[in-house]
From Swiss-Prot:
Its EC number is 2.1.1.37. This is Type II methyltransferase M.BepI. The keyword Cell division does not apply. Pfam families: DNA_methylase. The lineage of its organism: Bacteria, Bacillati, Actinomycetota, Actinomycetes, Micrococcales. Residues 1-400 form the SAM-dependent MTase C5-type domain. The keyword Ribosomal protein does not apply. It comes from the Bacteria. Keywords: DNA-binding, Methyltransferase, Restriction system, S-adenosyl-L-methionine, Transferase. GO terms for molecular function: DNA (cytosine-5-)-methyltransferase activity; DNA binding.
Amino acid sequence: MKVLSLFSGCGGMDLGLEGGFLAHRSSINSDLYASYISDHDENYVYLKKTGFETVFANDILPFAKLAWCNFFKNRVNQPENIFHLESIVDVVNNIENKQFSFPNDIDVVTGGFPCQDFSFAGKRKGFDSHKDHNGIIYNEPTEATRGQLYLWLKKVVEITKPKVFIAENVKGLVTLGDVKDIIQKDFRNIDDGYVVLDAQVLNAKNYGVAQNRERVIFIGISKRYANKKILDELISLQEKSEVYPYPPYTHGTDPELKPYATLNQILAHLPEPELASTDKSQQSYSKAKLFKKTQGNIEVNMNGQAPTIRAEHHGNIEFRRLSKENGGTNLSELHLPQRRLTVRECALIQSFPPDYEFVFNYGKANSVSASAAYKIIGNAVPPLLGFAIGRHLSQIWDKLFKT
């Protein structure tokens, strides 16, 4: 099944939908995922592929493309021909001007349209953002400014007519007036006709991610391709339907679920940065000083989940540990130097596999720095959240679209 990915970044959603990557054992509910896992080593299992394949990706960040292609080169031929380094506005304009065309027979369109203008951490300008798709600031908001780029995702859906589309954004969108309702209405008005269920806020920790990360997910299902009887049942029963597209929890406090993954579990096997002889991503971490009472200047709770990993500069990367003088509470690590989370630690917290290189060729052409890596990791959809969606969709696919 072919996936067209928009606002792809370093490919968290792409990788998740596809499967075929390593995940920490504490992050996987082996009872629910039994047919999708195979042993790898004492820390990791291998998640089998779901049947989805990314055939088009795009982003405006050069280092996002570098990281994406560097990882996906082991999964596809010529990944640089799949990933298009241009904005969604330029992509659509080039399609309409017949400069190039999308791949045929797209099954799924997915996109995490820019969230800065809807997030609690940002300025919450929403639809009134004056920054455009290439970062240029205008006097008045337009359809090409960040807060309205979901309309260009809508255009891509109208062009490609997939069976399913998935749109993702921050939880803050839900509390920003009637923004969620407006977006849902616009998605429901797509030319070819889609059933768009009420958007759901999913917390990544309920899917094995050792992080408290809430995201609002919109899912649309094509009326053209779906079985009418099954679709009518879905509309009527909503979450009680056997083809409800939002994935069930795998982790939580319910005794039938696996307990939430903790930072101690997913980070315990890592050496300290100075001892990480080959992994540049574990060697690299922000040296920014502690600034009390500002965002990101707290110590993570190793016995729980990390706060949301953000796509911001080094001074907002949480501390792996604080010193005793600065209020450090991680008793087993107080003898070690105070430091912030490494790039690798942030990546594992986001559930990226340990073989995904984020810092490479430093100081050379086509390099990705630690600063760039922090940014693309913080912008990403956690792969395990994407996998939960992809696995569940693959399981209900035939029933949804059988004729």
